[in-house]
Amino acid sequence: SIVTNLSGVSAGGLVAYTKLVTPILNSSFALALGLYVNNLLPGITVKAIAVVGICILFVLNLLGMDIFAKVSKILSTILLITMVLYVVFGLTQIKQPIFQFSGDKMFTGGFKGFMLAALLLINSANGYYNILWYGKDAKKATKDVPFASMACVPCLLFIYVGLAMVTGGVLPHDEVAGAPTILPAAQAILPGAVYKIFMIGGPIMAIITTLNGVFNDVRYPLAQAAKDGWLPKFILKENRFGAPYLIYTYTLIVVLIPIVTDMSIVTITNIFQVITFFMNVTVVYAISRLPKRYPEAWAKNKFHFSNGALYTFC
């Protein structure tokens, strides 16, 4: 609705239909969950864990927003505490020259490897954007949503940079390069029992919290698209807990398809980037039109800055 209002009907339709395929990204998170749990339970395949995990979260989200919010708070708190403790401890264990940028171990994958790593990082740090979809249910949307979104920045900087430094600094390059997870580094510096606790409270919890939000991240855009006439209105049907079960079921199917067809995490990520590039450009262009479409409201905005600064930011 926002994009349609600011940029026209065609732009709104592009965003609406793009949202039909964006859940595919969460297939990579489900597979990552499988990789981590498989390290604790090697008798269960990665694919089976991924499928069962996303199905459990699907059922959980069918129980309504209240359950979703309570579970998210608990899981996120455990995750934050675990990651901060691991980074703080891990920084004291660094033995490799991680800041020797001219060394032969830097940028071994060349420009292509660097860009692929950057794309993976972007995909892992887009939660701040998805907070926007919760504005409808927020008690003080104009205050809480911007604050929550901006609060993600320092958290991401500390945790992601810290994890990268620890993972690349505690073991020789050859032992961690190309590793699909941060587990080799964690296993090297943590005692056995502590390592397993870290696995559950850190990586596994991080993936679960991400997957837990996928259904609601898709719910609001698709529901609004249906209300605006882009999608059939029957998908708005809700169960007795207020959950749009048809939208959730569709989301589940989209997430499961790449898993059961054995797509790699990198392939899923690249597909997602191509699909969402045009949507993101459309959204940014719409934002740049705010001063022209709503000059008075823009001038009174709490986060107001000059038009030139807005265009530069966009």
Predicted features along the sequence, with ranges:
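C-terminal membrane-solvent junction of multi-pass transporters and transport-like membrane proteins
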Residues: F234-Y245, N280-C314
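TM-loop-TM module centered on a large, flexible mid-protein loop between adjacent transmembrane helices
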Residues: S1-G8, N39-L41, M150-N212, L231-T267
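Alpha-helical transmembrane segments of integral membrane proteins
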Residues: S10-A16, K47-V52, K70-L80, F114-A117, ...
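Transmembrane alpha-helical segments of multi-pass small-molecule transport proteins
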Residues: V15, L40-I67, L79-F89, S124, ...
